Amino acid sequence: MSTNQKTIVIVDDEKAYADFLTAMLTETFGCPVRTFHRATDALAELAGVNAGIVITDYHMPQMTGLVFIQRASKIAPGVPFVLVTGNSFHCDDHAVGPDLPLRAILTKPFSWRKLADEILRHAPDLALKPGRAVGMASPDTPA
């Protein structure tokens, strides 16, 4: 594995859900996936991770996903973020701020294809594993 290889980072306090995402992303993409169940742990270690994209939950016990993104973007400038939430969520440019690297908001349940498309759109250097297509096994598998 190349030391320059980008990593997909997942930050979600729901262990079963985060582990499911990790398994699906590992199976689909040809890059490492790093999972954190606590936002503070992710912040402490993010500088040492060559992140290609960060997927974070909105509702977490220590801080919201938006607060996490604000802090993490200072540690890992230029890395895109995808926010995942179980509730309908709306934020405009004023709530998020023009400098926040939030690239997409996905409301659970969303299709696996939608998440993979967002990853490929905002982190095009993260490649699918050879022979894999987005949603190859089940394109509408809820994530």
Model-derived regions: residue spans:
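Two-component/phosphorelay signaling modules centered on CheY-like receiver
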Residues: 15-34
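Acidic, metal-coordinating helix/loop segments flanking the phosphotransfer/catalytic sites
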Residues: 35-53
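Acidic catalytic/metal-coordinating carboxylates
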Residues: 37-38, 64-67
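Active-site residues of response regulator receiver
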Residues: 57, 85
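Receiver (REC) domain active-site loop signature in two-component systems and cognate sites
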Residues: 60
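Alpha4 helix (beta4-alpha4-beta5 surface) of REC/receiver domains from two-component response regulators
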Residues: 67, 88-105, 113, 117
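C-terminal output helix
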Residues: 110-123, 127, 131
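CheY-like receiver
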Residues: 126-143
